[in-house]
């Protein structure tokens, strides 16, 4: 499944190995990431949200349509 990120890049979630979210203190936003490989920095940022709850909801919606591990 291809998704367009908030920054207009296309990411194939079928090739991702996992999803997670984290708080970016610089931007003061919660960021949902899709991991694409073995390395710590092999990921695409999918979108930003204002609250942790929104980030969890986005991540769970994405995980419901593709087979990825939620980290």
What are these model-predicted stretches?
Residues 1-71:
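Eukaryotic intrinsically disordered, low-complexity regulatory linkers and tails enriched in Ser/Thr/Pro
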């Amino acid at each position: 499944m291809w998704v367009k990120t908030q920054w207009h890049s296309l990411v194939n979630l079928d090739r991702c190995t996992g999803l997670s979210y984290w708080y970016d203190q610089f931007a003061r936003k919660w960021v949902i990431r899709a991991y694409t490989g073995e390395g710590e920095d092999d990921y695409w940022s999918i979108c930003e949200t204002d609250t942790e709850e929104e980030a969890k909801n986005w991540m769970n919606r994405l995980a419901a349509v593709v087979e990825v591990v939620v980290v």
